[in-house]
């Protein structure tokens, strides 16, 4: 019996949710979400979780399953998602549908992650506290001194990536880059990847409109309810950081909306750049 994992990927707002629900219904599969933001609770508007009707039509996994206060890594996702996939195949599924736009999560499922040392929760909490007081630039500079290679390769504005790399350096006494072997981990199932794409102007228009819809649906109120947790890892992301700035009265709402739209477009471009290097993806215009 065949065991095929169909991964539907693509930039934010391209239409992955509708496409994946359709495929899941076709194959009698649940939808396994591969989204590093939708996995957190209490962030439904800003992460564009599937609608109530979509969630009712098909069973979804990894949607709002982790508390916003909990640190959750691509390594955690690899362990849980691969175990789930294996169990569902053992239950008789021949094709499973996975969908998302998180590059590191998808790569973790397809190729496995390098064997990094165990994390240190106390050290991680200390680094996040320092982030709030000193800013990401100070931590990035510390990473540069300990691991120039990783510093040159990652987005040093991404506080989560900087903190994870720095944590590994401090725990192990070795550069984060020294653990990256690039060896692929074998899987007991076939993987097929479908990438969804649209003309750039159409995609950007959809992104801009989605942000406006989020505001109408209550994004500001959602972010306000999360103010006590603003320093948590889950909230260091587009759509939340900008509204926090608005709630701090540092920028007007119109500017926050503009920044969310711009930063989301930049993220979509980064996603496409990453995946265009993968020859195994079959691209589909939607």
Where are these regions (language model features)?
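Phosphate/pyrophosphate-binding catalytic cores of soluble transferases and nucleic-acid-acting enzymes
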Residues: 1-286
